[in-house]
C-alpha cells in the first residue's frame, strides 16, 4: 500500500496537483488488485486503525511498539504478540515502500498476475509512443 500511496513527481513544467499513485492510476491497472488474505482480519483491522505510520519531523516513520500497544488497549483489540509484530512489520514495510516508491517508474511490489501487468504496461508504452508521434 505504500507504493499506492506514494506521490511520484510531476513533469517540471506541470502545474497539476501532486496526487498519490492510487488516485492517478486507471481503475484497470493490475496493481490496484490487492491480495486476498484469510484469517488475519484482526491484524488488518489494527493496521487500518493505526493509520499505517507515525508522522515525524523527517516524514513518515514506522509505528512504535508503544503506539501499537496503546492502540491495542484503547481500541480493545486484544491482539496477541504475533499480531502486534505483524502490525509493526507492516508499518515498516509501508514506510519503506512509501519512501522508495516516490519515483515515477518504480514497479509495484506485488501484482496478482504478472502477465496481465506486463500486457498492461506494454499497452501503456504503446499509447505513450503514439501520443508523442501525434503531439511532438
Each language-model region and where it sits:
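Charged interaction scaffolds used for protein-protein
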Residues: 1-74, 81-136
Amino acid at each position: 500500500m505504500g507504493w499506492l500511496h506514494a506521490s511520484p513527481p510531476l513533469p517540471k513544467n506541470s502545474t497539476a496537483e501532486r496526487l498519490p499513485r492510487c488516485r492517478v492510476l486507471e481503475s484497470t491497472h493490475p496493481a490496484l488488485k490487492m491480495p486476498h488474505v484469510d484469517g488475519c482480519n484482526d491484524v488488518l483491522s489494527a493496521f487500518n486503525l493505526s493509520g499505517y505510520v507515525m508522522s515525524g519531523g523527517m516524514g513518515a516513520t514506522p509505528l512504535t511498539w508503544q503506539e501499537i500497544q496503546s492502540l491495542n488497549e484503547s481500541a480493545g483489540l486484544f491482539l496477541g504478540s504475533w499480531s502486534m509484530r505483524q502490525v509493526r512489520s507492516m508499518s515498516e514495510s509501508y514506510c519503506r515502500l512509501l519512501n522508495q516508491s516516490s519515483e515515477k517508474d518504480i514497479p509495484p511490489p506485488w501484482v496478482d498476475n504478472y502477465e496481465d501487468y506486463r500486457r498492461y504496461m506494454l499497452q501503456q508504452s504503446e499509447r505513450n509512443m503514439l501520443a508523442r508521434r501525434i503531439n511532438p
